[in-house]
Amino acid sequence: MRNMYVVASELARGHSKVKAQVCASEIHSLNKKSEYGQIIKATRAALACAVAAALGFFSPLAMADNQVSYADAQPHVLDASTPPMSYSGTDEGAALYVSGVATVGWQPTKVTGSGLVIETSGGGADDPDGGKYVSNAISLDHYAILELTDTQITTTGIYTQGISAADGSTLTLTDSTLTIDGNFGVMTLYTGSEATLNDTTVQAANGSSVQVQQGSTLNVLDGSKITLAQGQINVVAGNTATDEGSTLNLSDSSVSSAGTMSTIQGTNKAALNLTNATITHTNASGAAVQANNATTLDISGGNITSAGTGVYILASDARIDGATINADGDGIFITSKKRSTSYEDLNALTVNKAQVNSDTIALHVDTGTTINAPIVLTDSTFEAPEVIKLGSKAVIQANNTTLIGDVAQSDMSSSSLSLSQGSTLTGSVDAMFTTLSLDDTSQWNMTDPSTVGNLTNDGDITLGNASGSTGTLLTVDNTLTLQDNSQINATLDTANSAPIIKAANVTLDGTLNLSSTATFVAPETDEHFGSITLIDSQSAITTDFDSVTLDADTSAMPDYLTINAGVDANDNTNYELSTGLSWYAGANSARAAHGTFTVDAGSTFTVTSELDETTATSNWNGSKLTKQGDGTLILSNTGNDYGDTEIDGGILAAKDAAALGTGDVTIAESATLALSQGTLDNNVTGGGQIVKSGSDELIVTGDNNYSGGTTITGGTLTADHADSLGTGAVANSGVLQVGEGELENTLSGSGSLVKTGTGELTLSGDNTYSGGTTITGGTLTADHADSLGSDDIDNSGVLQVGEGDLENTLSGSGSLVKTGTGELTLSGGNDYSGGTTIIGGTLTADHADSLGTGAVANSGVLQVGEGELENTLSGSGSLVKTGTGELTLSGDNSYSGG
């Protein structure tokens, strides 16, 4: 009997010396390390069923170190009264060993327990194959079932492991603790085994890890906490694509590690299902979660924190939903490098309702990486200095997602990033080969100058310049397409010396919103208008924005100026922002087109541009010029072809009258029309005045009734008809030439009056002009001598005077005609030679010299004081000698009036 006991005991302890096993025999490989982590496989020996049956030992066997073994296909229940189970041997034994029984197929042995203590400190003996034996606190195989509650499992010593489960075994730990002080692992699950941790705490020192292999499953649930000093949870199938995948289900629990390997790693068709989990990786190397070689990663909720990479995806499929990722390194890293060629290079990523924060790159696509389907980001937020880095071709779709940080591209592949459903990108883009698109709900807040391959925008783009660059803000290497809902927002600075947008091809639509903090300084002439090139295209720009707005302090900008935006008329590859006349304001100008020029007092503005009739607006007919304000508006272009002119204040000046367009001119009271030359054939009305300046001739031909008067400061003012001079006084310091009509205006000043043409000009004003009078032809009629001013009269026509004292000296070949019944007195030393005619009344000359040299035809009364009257006297009138002097008649006279 004793010998049989020894044999059974050795079998139960898995002693390496026992080679013959009655019911089952399976020798597993010694300790090995795979490419993706440490795989522990301690040798085990089943309890010999036949020996145990012969001895009746299907109850726990009390061995040395109080080992406990079950292999009877029967249920067993342990409780707190069970003595602590332990093993300290140097071979590969276990404190608790459970195995199924080989009958018709393997029959499971089930053990349940509560309040147990299980510990091991053994292992370390040399294995004949060159390794070291590792002891386990718990060893399960052949479909064994172990369910423990409130159990303390402890390992001490280098060559110890907490749990080994193989061959379809099942382990459940609830409200338990697993304390690992060795180097050879927390647990190893392989060949289809399954372990479930419910509200269980695992504390592992050194490099001890959790290994889930060969189609096994680990469930970490309900508040379980796994703390690994340097280890990881490594979920791996095998080394070929046909090996069955292993699974980790981590729910409402936490895992942390400070090791250089990733805290959770799935490899070779593994399945990582992480639900509301907290995963912490405190080493700058490795990742919090890593999926390799066709692994499926599902993260739902929870928090992932890493001093290295947050989520590492190697040729695998990842779905992240509702999780928060905080990483010092990359938030999410996708690569194809170092993948196993046994598996397809399938990289896929979808992110939904997640928060990804990184100190470096939030989403990183490595160089040489294959992305098989669009990366879809939905209802999520990504934030990092570089929010996206593209090292390989990728299609990224952001739906209602916030991207904060720069987008960079390090390769030359054709990638794309689309923002839709209210997505926002805040940062710069350096991606010359990437197509960026925004739908009508999305926006890009560009922080610094950016480059893209193609840009299609139906949303809102703000061109930022945090670095204060003086160069181009947005460069589109190929095609810029702005759609109907597009909003482009840009702040202009005086430092902008280059176009803010450059592109090879440009299609414009939507709205351009501009702002500026610069102070507007009004120019004195339209020759000083400035412009900025907003968009520089390599091909012709044939479209335009629907509207352009300008948010700037334009309080100093007068109403006749505006800011225009449009294709440069001289270079259709440029889209310009320029100062221009409101007269020609278009749809994309800062203010609507109008014809009002308000020039403030003390200011002058000169228009050299041609003002032509243009498209009417709701408030303007497109052809009328209105001058307002007390300042001066100067029109210098004689090609102006607009309509009416209204001068409501100040001065409207034109060197040439042709600059006034073709319509009527209205001059308000106290306003002035100042002209130098040309022909003013416009009709002039109103209470204002005309000022003729300069040395040239101004001809007025209109039927004018302006009442503010006329001032001639120099040169010649010619009116074919007196009606052209309005009704106001004429202050003449030059030459006034009038052809005919009734000149009722009062004439003053140092200038002269010239009667031109063959018609009759009648003067009726009380005139004081002193520059003399010239009659070049026709008849000049003055009812009173006072109308003829005070200087000489050079008469080559007919001068008709009614009465008064004509003290002016008369000369020339013209004649003098005395009209009316009144008395006209001549007192000048006159030498006119055209003769004198007295139609009626009395012509009085103190001296005969006043009567010129021509004959006198007298039908009235001629009174002469003295002198030699050599003129021939004729007519029915009389001659009266007046005064005390001597009058001598020498002509052959025939007058008959006595």
Describe each model-derived feature in a short phrase:
Residues A64-S69, S88-T103, T120-D141, T156-A166, ...:
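Extracellular beta-strand/beta-solenoid scaffold signature
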